């Protein structure tokens, strides 16, 4: 199987900036991260009514695990320098607008975790929507993961 062709230029750019790095061995198996995404989403869903802020953050974490699983399956992982933005850039470049909500989840999670101005709490409706968006990302990752090979 050849590497995923869409987004090659962006992945090469992120590697050059050291925002992504190559990994091998167990670190290049995205399945365990995808399983963690499913578990985390279940937890987020179960606490939405009682703790919307935490549910939102967990929904984002679940989406991030799924996105990182797609990178891992290609022998890639974000570095500390690249962080969550590198994950967003890579998956959007490779897999398109189906992952657009990841950016919103990431930005809103930052607002909740590091409040400065504006709405610094979530509510049940927003948390429920975050769980649904995360579920869509995870379902897409479930479909994509078996079709990915090393980016080399």
What does each model-found stretch correspond to?
Residues 1-152:
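Terminal alpha-helical segments
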């Amino acid at each position: 199987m050849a590497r995923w062709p869409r987004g090659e230029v962006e992945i090469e750019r992120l590697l050059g900036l050291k925002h992504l790095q190559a990994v091998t061995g167990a670190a290049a198996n995205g399945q365990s991260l995808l399983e963690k995404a499913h578990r985390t989403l279940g937890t987020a869903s179960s606490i939405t009514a009682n703790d919307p802020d935490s549910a939102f953050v967990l929904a984002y974490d679940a989406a991030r695990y799924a996105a990182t699983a797609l990178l891992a399956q290609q022998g890639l992982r974000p570095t500390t320098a690249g962080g969550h933005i590198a994950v967003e850039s890579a998956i959007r470049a490779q897999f398109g607008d189906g992952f657009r909500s990841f950016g919103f989840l990431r930005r809103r999670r930052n607002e909740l975790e590091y409040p400065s101005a504006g709405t610094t709490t979530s509510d049940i409706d927003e948390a429920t929507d975050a769980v649904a968006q995360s579920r869509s990302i995870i379902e897409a990752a479930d479909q994509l993961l078996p079709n990915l090979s090393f980016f080399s």
